[in-house]
Each structure stands twice: as structure tokens, then as C-alpha cells.
UniProtKB/Swiss-Prot annotation:
Propeptide boundaries: 25-144
Keywords on record: Disulfide bond, Glycoprotein, Hydrolase, Protease, Signal, Thiol protease, Zymogen
Catalytic site: 169, 309, 329
Keyword Disulfide bond: yes
Family in the record: Belongs to the peptidase C1 family.
GO MF terms, alphabetically ordered: cysteine-type endopeptidase activity
Lineage: Eukaryota, Viridiplantae, Streptophyta, Embryophyta, Tracheophyta
Disulfide partners: 166-209, 200-242, 300-350
Protein name as it appears in the record: Oryzain gamma chain
PROSITE patterns attached to this UniProt entry: THIOL_PROTEASE_ASN, THIOL_PROTEASE_CYS, THIOL_PROTEASE_HIS
Length: 362
């Protein structure tokens, strides 16, 4: 009897280990679909989900996801719709991670959003970044270019922020670049107002929550006389009335520098020897589930009219033989690799060097 019990325990352990490996390959721990939620919250949501979907492992997995990310669904029809999207996202994660690519996907809070919803709430409309057609970055001594760079180690990169349900990525790329430049120049941290750019920079071919470009934002700040601090002009994530106040300015821009369209050698020179650079690229569906590794794709475009998301290049390096850009995103610190991702370098991947610029601060 004791011998049989040991065999059963070993078998159970093997099953558990297999489940854990499968969960790891999907980027989503489903070994116990309801384990990490509170009893009260789990019970309430489980009842809602079971009523709409039936008592299945997948339904409980979905309930756990919803509780973890604070989801609220209006009725049974919405539960069913979100569950269907979630299931498609889970399959995308698993199938991608089985391909042996240099990056991995994982389930995150975007897993129950359709691609159309995600585009509308997180990405901007394509912009014709004509400023980079003829760049004005002066190449610095290539002999001084470090093999790897991470400006976070220099203490000038500000914390990751979250743009919320507003296509204002361009404002966060802009403030991230300015915050780094200001701290580099003064030794002092600063948090700058994205909302001022959303509300006030429309005359410079920017469109608030519908998109814009850092190069155009730098021009606005230069001629406006400055950008207010975050404290004085806090973020709301919706288009509003401009209420910029000169007395609350946190930084002024003397000029901006543009990287020649597609010139990754210029971009590397700037990131390695100057400071973090605002960049933009084309987000395609799978990218929103990025978890770790060096992202690469054969399906994204590289032209100015392809790019739809602005971010901040804060370094570069090599991982498992693949050169990469280290990039700060604006989807919160719980997204990706603590709010960051790596993008393959050397192919102008997804247009990463197509619309790149950085400011010179006063």
C-alpha cells in the first residue's frame, strides 16, 4: 500500500511539473486557475462567469485573469465576448512561444481587448514625420561608442508611466526624452506634463489622444516657451482645454535634433553618446502581449506612414547573439519587462529608426 501511495504521489508531482512547464510556455500560470484571488472576489466573479460560460477550467482561468486585472463586465453577452477574445489571445501566446523565437509573449491586461479596441485606445494615427527626411544629428567619435548602453544605469531615465486609454504615446515619448535631458543637465529629477501636450500642441500637427510626433512636440515646446511640470498640469488621459501657465514651466527646449530616416548608425551614435532618443515604430497585434526577449517580426512596416506608436530608446546591447534596442514604453510598469522591451537592431525593425529625434534643453 505504501509503495502504491509513493507511486501515486510521484505521478501527481509529474503531472504538476508538466502543467507548470505548459503554463510557462504560455506566459500564463494556469496550474490553479483561481488560486491567487481572494475568496470573496473569486466567488462573485466565478458565479458571473459560470452563469455565462459554464463551470470549466478555461472559465475559471478567465475569472482569475479578470480579477487580477480589475476587469468589470456588464452582462453575460459581454462576458462571453471577452472570454472569446481572451481565449484567442491565449492561443496566440502559446503558438508564438512554441516557435523558438528570440522573444516570448505572455498574457497581460490587454488579453480581453480586440485588436481594433487596442488600436483605438493605445495607438496613434500614422504621421508623416518629414522632419527626419534630412537629419541633423552630428555623428560623434565612433571610437568612443560603448558596446552596450543602458541610460538607466546613469540615473537619468524617469519611471515608466501609463498613457491609459488615450493615443497619447507621443507625449510620453516626448516627456521621457525631456526628463532624461533635464536630469542629465542638472542632476535633478523632474516629471513633465503630458496633458499639456495633449491639450495645447494641436497647432503643430498633433492630435491629442489621436496621435502626434515627438519632433512636432519639441517644436511646440520651443516656441511656446516651455512645458509645465506634471504636478502643475496633471494627466487626465482625455482631450481638454489648454491651460498652460508659464510660471509652472519645468523645462524649456532650445532646439531638437532629428535622426535621418532609417539611419540606425546615427540612432546608435545618439543613444550611445548623447542620451535617450524618442523613436516610433509600427505595433502589430502580437506585440501587445510582449513579455521578454528581443522582439522581431517579418510583418511590420518601416515607412513613416506605418509607424503608430512613439516610445523612448534608452540603450542597446546583445542578447543570445541578437543585437537589440532597449526601449521604454508607456503602458505601465506591469507590461512587458517592467515596462520596457527589446527590439532587434540592424534592420530598422518595424521602423524604429524612421521617426527618431531628441531635444536640446535650456
Amino acid at each position: 500500500m505504501a509503495h502504491r501511495r509513493i507511486i501515486l504521489l510521484l505521478a501527481a508531482a509529474a503531472v504538476a511539473a508538466t502543467s507548470a512547464v505548459a503554463a510557462a510556455s504560455s506566459g500564463f500560470d494556469d496550474s490553479n486557475p483561481i488560486r491567487s484571488v481572494t475568496d470573496h472576489a473569486a466567488s462573485a466573479l466565478e458565479s458571473t462567469v459560470i452563469a455565462a460560460l459554464g463551470r470549466t477550467r478555461d472559465a475559471l482561468r478567465f475569472a482569475r485573469f479578470a480579477v487580477r486585472h480589475g476587469k468589470r463586465y456588464g452582462d453575460a453577452a459581454e462576458v462571453q465576448r471577452r472570454f472569446r477574445i481572451f481565449s484567442e489571445s491565449l492561443e496566440l501566446v502559446r503558438s508564438t512561444n512554441r516557435r523558438g523565437l528570440p522573444y516570448r509573449l505572455g498574457i497581460n491586461r490587454f488579453a480581453d481587448m480586440s485588436w481594433e479596441e487596442f488600436q483605438a485606445s493605445r495607438l496613434g494615427a500614422a504621421q508623416n514625420c518629414s522632419a527626419t527626411l534630412a537629419g541633423n544629428h552630428r555623428m560623434r567619435d565612433a571610437a568612443a561608442l560603448p558596446e552596450t548602453k543602458d541610460w538607466r544605469e546613469d540615473g537619468i531615465v524617469s519611471p515608466v508611466k501609463d498613457q491609459g486609454h488615450c493615443g497619447s504615446c507621443w507625449t510620453f515619448s516626448t516627456t521621457g526624452s525631456l526628463e532624461a535631458a533635464y536630469t542629465q543637465a542638472t542632476g535633478k529629477p523632474v516629471s513633465l506634463s503630458e496633458q499639456q501636450l495633449v491639450d495645447c500642441a494641436t497647432a503643430y500637427n498633433n492630435f491629442g489622444c489621436s496621435g502626434g510626433l515627438p519632433s512636432q512636440a519639441f517644436e511646440y515646446i520651443k516656441y511656446n516657451g516651455g512645458l509645465d511640470t506634471e504636478e502643475a498640469y496633471p494627466y487626465t488621459g482625455v482631450n481638454g482645454i489648454c491651460h498652460y501657465k508659464p510660471e509652472n514651466v519645468g523645462v524649456k527646449v532650445l532646439d531638437s535634433v532629428n535622426i535621418t530616416l532609417g539611419a540606425e548608425d546615427e540612432l546608435k551614435n545618439a543613444v550611445g553618446l548623447v542620451r535617450p532618443v524618442s523613436v516610433a515604430f509600427q505595433v502589430i497585434n502580437g506585440f501587445r502581449m510582449y513579455k521578454s526577449g528581443v522582439y522581431t517580426s517579418d510583418h511590420c512596416g518601416t515607412s513613416p506612414m506605418d509607424v503608430n506608436h512613439a516610445v523612448l530608446a534608452v540603450g542597446y546591447g546583445v542578447e543570445n547573439g541578437v543585437p537589440y534596442w532597449l526601449i521604454k514604453n508607456s503602458w505601465g510598469a506591469d507590461w512587458g519587462d517592467n515596462g520596457y522591451f527589446k527590439m532587434e537592431m540592424g534592420k530598422n525593425m518595424c521602423g524604429i529608426a524612421t521617426c527618431a529625434s531628441y531635444p536640446i534643453v535650456a
